[in-house]
Amino acid sequence: MADEEKREMKPQEAEAMAAAPKEAVEKVSDEEFASIMGDAFADFSKLANLLPSFKTADGDLVRGVEWLDPKKDFQRKDFLSKPDFAKQRKLLVHRLKIWMDFLSRSGSLDDIRKNLNEEAAKLETNLEKNMRKVHKASREMETTYRAVDKFFANAQQEPDEKVNAYFANISAEELTNPNDKEKFENLTKAIAELYREWSIKECFAMCVVPGYLGSVENIDTFGRQLGFPNKVHILTDLPNFEKFEEVMDMLEDPSYANLMGIDNYKQYVSVFANYLMARNANQYEDEDMWTPPSAAVAGKMYQGDTIVGMQQPMAGFKYGKISDAKYLRFKANQPDASKINEKGVNPLVSFEGTAVAMGAATLFSKETFNVYSIRRTYDYVYKTMRNYLNKQTFTVIDQKFIDAMRKDIDKFMKAITGGDNILQDYNVVIFADDEMRRRQEIDVKVSLNPKYPARTFNIEFVAWNQDNQTNVKDK
């Protein structure tokens, strides 16, 4: 019975202890505070000089004890009561606690000064260590956001202009993970679904994957499974090389011999080299930050479609100047850029102090569709005509219908041909014989004569004296 009473008494004792009154804390009124901190205490200005306000390296102001000056009643009350100063009050309390801690220890002023310096050094070392970890952990994300910023800087003519762009929150490494293809399949499905609608006005034209996809096989996968079936142009990059020689070492490696090729899906891939500086390294980083060039060039292409037309590659000094880009990772002169371009890769170069895209190549090695502007022009015409023809299905096939189609298509083709338009010339043939009509089919054959960009100028000088003719040919 006694043991049971003891067990029953324990929770009651705990409750009694919990209910014990807290130690009373004496509150100091404003008048008493002023008298304590006034002449009876000491000269407040001397104390204020010991703990003044200061600015951090980031420009943030840390308030000092001068904001508690009893002679400045209005300022002191604002500082102690307004929510705007909550963060500053917390910082000041922390500073005062540090001073109180060190002053309460026994020892001379020299000992206090020494201990403060040692503690400050430890905190500085710990801060630097943690900040390096923070910047290292967030570097990839920051690079992505700065690449997105480069895209908008080149896509927009005005800061508030609407840009039709969609973003997938997924990295290139995740998209190319051989052990988890679900993310790549989901992205491909999202793009394919819009292209398979009856109306394809909202389908995608470009897919930008900033950074290196890891291998020729991965680049081909994007072109074969995403670009070619959906008529979407893929823009991506080589790795972030520091030197031109590193680029060529990679491109001349036997494992990259198949980067260019005659497979049709290679018409839908453009690769870029020479990264853009995003910002200089800060005190917690060892290297500057660089962004992949494909994002900036994609923005330039988006803007170019509206301003000059997709027939014009966003390349060269006149049309390929990259906005918000001053420094490039490495220098590439004319021979260097030509060597990179011969491998199907488009380098960025510094031209009169401006970053310029100096190439409009695809990975297709044959003529015509080895230029992205021509491939995109063909795709635009195809998508527009397909969208129109989808609206004509199940109309009775007779001469009136064929003539009406021919008139509509001819009107569209004339509107995009000649002058500053996207085509040089075209030819359209619409045909349906009796056998085809029984199968409910109509042939629409379109031949396009696109506009080709100038890449090389052959300069030939001939001496005026025909008897002693001198030829100088430079390519």
Identify the role of each PLM range.
Residues A2-V396, N421-D425, F431-D433:
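A glycine- and small-residue-enriched flexible loop/hinge signal that marks low-structured segments
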Residues D3, T377-V381, M385, M405, ...:
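Generic hydrophobic secondary-structure signal
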Residues Y212, K414, K451:
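Residue-level marker of positions within ordered structural domains that often coincide
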Residues F401, M405-S447:
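C-terminal structured domain segments
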